[in-house]
Amino acid sequence: MKKKWMAAGLMILSVYVLTACMAGQQSTDSPDNKNISAELVWDSSMELRYATEFQVDRYEGGYELLTIVQDGRYLVVPEGKEAPSDLSEDIVVLQQPIEHIYLVASAVMDMFVSLDALDRVGFSGLRADSWYIEEARAAMERGEILHAGSYSAPDYEQIVSKGCGLAVENTMIYHTPEVKEQLEKLKVPVLVDYSSYESNPLGRTEWVRLYGVLVGKEEEAKKAFEEEVRAFEAVDQEEKTGSTVAFFYISTNGEVNVRRSSDYLPKMITMAGGSYVFEHLGEEEDTASSNVTMQMEEFYAAAKDADYIIYNSTTTEELSSIEELLEKSSLLEKFRAV
């Protein structure tokens, strides 16, 4: 058995799985989404290149309306100004500056780092030792970001006492709707991140522009996104290796969890010049979930000859050696990559 990680083709990635039930959908092109108040004059819409799950409409005076297709609408009100008096009840008002954010959608933290906006985050859904983003871990160790409980069990008292201006959740919050309701009762606005529902990897990346609006750093967000686009384009110009890749994790009951071929991760593998071993997996099923569960024997039959196997260690626990991987299943030792 090869001992070197590169020779083994085993990479430990820090990728968070975001899945949940679909919420009600509303059209972002409806005139009602732009004409939201007699006191506001619509100016323009943000031009998005890849993202389809959100929209930003700008109004005179610096007001901006964020529409998350499967979640709701949020009016960002400039500092020193007031929200219109005739807004629809479904529009959540976010008064700038938005501070002491309770960030539960862990995958969003990297966007705040790229915007140099960690100072806007006051609370984390993860503990310091669970963070794979060094800047977040360090901020928590310094006491600048506090742990305020998970999505299903937040520390309401701490969140409210520190003046939390916004809770950014992932779609797991819909498994515990009572938590969302309680936060809203306590006057903490809740925004649900749907970036994981973008079919294009660059669509997920473009959500940095939504967070740029929230923290008042739109130009920085646009620049950060364009840098990611250039990086993707550079990779796309590289020679395609055709190397086969499997991405998976093993649950506590021994079942193997892999991504549907329509998920963004298989698409990223293809964009990087590789080939996902489960080329058409789950395409015939109409479901919002990006995951498919199978028995180890089925996984072995499909992936045993893969050039690379990528273990998603953040879903269970972090692995640091091939030996720890083999403890998950002795059958893995028979894989060519191992």
How should each PLM-predicted stretch be described?
Residues 88, 95-98, 105-112, 156, ...:
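Extracytoplasmic/secreted envelope proteins and their assembly/folding machinery
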Residues 118-121, 180-193, 320-338:
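A short, gly/pro- and small-residue-rich
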Residues 198-222, 226, 305-338:
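Structured C-terminal subdomain patch of bacterial secreted/periplasmic proteins
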Residues 5-24:
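Sec-dependent N-terminal signal peptides of Gram-positive bacterial secreted proteins and lipoproteins
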Residues 64-160, 166-172:
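A short, structured surface patch at a secondary-structure boundary
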Residues 100, 144, 157, 161-168, ...:
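Extracytoplasmic substrate-binding proteins
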Residues 21-109, 220-247:
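Bacterial Sec-exported substrate-binding components of ABC uptake systems
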Residues 237-323:
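Flexible, glycine-rich surface segments
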